[in-house]
């Protein structure tokens, strides 16, 4: 009788653990699927300390880049007592700071330079097949944004935080050729070479008069 009771108890525990494991696995799969929609890059993790009356209190900070690989990217900075919690906070902040990067055929629309504190980053468009020619922190931002061909160079501080924010500042300065042409009352292919030295606008944008319908020959 006791053996039967023990067997029933074991079966019930096994069934309960199987059900709980299945539910946890389902939740984990849901989280992985949601995470799979975005590219996440942890650029830097630092340990910081705070001196209090009882001694020192240690915590961790994480600089995280999140993007969809198709022109949306954001930067987040998280702080917590544990590394995973700091990364999670950084990811949440990065998703709240998403912005759109104008891209044409996998590269940026024109050369641009961004600055943040002592960080200075220069970005130039590149022809297809060039790849992402950039350093670690700059590369993380560009890859998450979905840039496939670009030339980048850091001209200022090597601090990862400054470099990342300088890269973001540069990307936020980008403009689409058709928008600039519309403001100037020009065709998209008539922009000066000084603004578009790589010829991206004239070759890959819609070439038509602004505000008028092209007369048929």
Swiss-Prot record:
UniProt GO BP: translation
Molecular functions per Gene Ontology: rRNA binding; structural constituent of ribosome
Gene Ontology cellular component list: small ribosomal subunit
Spans annotated as Disordered: 1-33, 185-217
S5 DRBM domain: residues covered: 38-101
Coiled-coil spans in chain: none
Keyword Ribosomal protein: yes
Disulfide bonds: none
InterPro entries in the record: Ribosomal_Su5_D2-typ_SF (IPR020568), Ribosomal_uS5 (IPR000851), Ribosomal_uS5_bac-type (IPR005712), Ribosomal_uS5_C (IPR005324), Ribosomal_uS5_N (IPR013810), Ribosomal_uS5_N_CS (IPR018192), Ribsml_uS5_D2-typ_fold_subgr (IPR014721)
Family assignment from sequence similarity: Belongs to the universal ribosomal protein uS5 family.
Role played: With S4 and S12 plays an important role in translational accuracy.
UniProt cross-references to NCBIfam families, sorted A to Z: rpsE_bact
Complexes and interactors: Part of the 30S ribosomal subunit. Contacts proteins S4 and S8.
Name of the protein described by the UniProt record: Small ribosomal subunit protein uS5
Organism: Mycobacterium leprae (strain TN)
């Amino acid at each position: 009788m006791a053996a039967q009771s023990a067997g029933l108890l074991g079966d019930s525990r096994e069934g309960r653990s199987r059900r709980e494991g299945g539910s946890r696995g389902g939740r984990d799969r849901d989280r992985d699927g949601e995470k799979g929609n975005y590219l996440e890059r942890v650029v830097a993790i630092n340990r910081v300390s705070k001196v209090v009356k009882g001694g020192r209190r240690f915590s961790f900070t994480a600089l995280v880049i999140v993007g969809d690989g198709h022109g949306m990217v954001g930067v987040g900075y998280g702080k917590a007592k544990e590394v995973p919690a700091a990364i999670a906070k950084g990811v949440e902040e990065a998703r709240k700071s998403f912005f759109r990067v104008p891209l044409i055929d996998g590269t940026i629309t024109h050369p641009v330079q961004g600055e943040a504190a002592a960080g200075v980053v220069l970005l130039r468009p590149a022809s297809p097949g060039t790849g992402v020619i950039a350093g670690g922190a700059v590369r993380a931002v560009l890859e998450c944004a979905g840039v496939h061909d670009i030339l980048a160079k850091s001209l200022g501080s090597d601090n990862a935080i400054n470099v990342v924010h300088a890269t973001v500042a540069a990307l936020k300065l980008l403009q689409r050729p058709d928008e600039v042409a519309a403001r100037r009352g020009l065709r998209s292919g008539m922009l000066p070479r000084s603004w578009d030295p790589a010829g991206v606008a004239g070759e890959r944008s819609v070439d038509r008069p602004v505000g008028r319908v092209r007369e048929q020959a």
